[in-house]
Amino acid sequence: MFIEGRVLDETGEPVSGAMIDLWQANSFGRYRHPFDQSDQPLDDNFQGWAIIQSDETGGFRFKTVVPGAYPAGQGWVRPPHLHFKVNKLGFIKLTTQMYFPEQKLNEKDLLLKQKSDSQQQAMIASSAGVTADGETIYRYDIVLRKA
């Protein structure tokens, strides 16, 4: 799948040169991190993180896999999601998560449920079609506040 979007300021203007640090679990729901003690398999072909930069239009695009859900506590299963930390001089650093549309587990996610309806909508990507090769594209725009 592909994730594409733009980094914008609060007025809708593009933020070029924003550093986007992203990380996620693999398709089995396991992070490539020493503190993830899951018994799910690691994928030697999947790094699980990247640092990219928004272009002159604020745009970004990357290819990844759909992360797997994973248990996070007593009766709590995290839905598939990606983590983003976005930073640009002159703006307040944003750390957030991107969720996928139409995921049943979104309704029960303890972190997502803490957010207002408008915040939840901003955190859920939208379907943006498929590539010529049949790969799903999701759209996720990120808004930074000026410092």
Residue ranges and their predicted role:
Residues 1-147:
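Beta-strand-dominated extracellular/periplasmic modules and repeats
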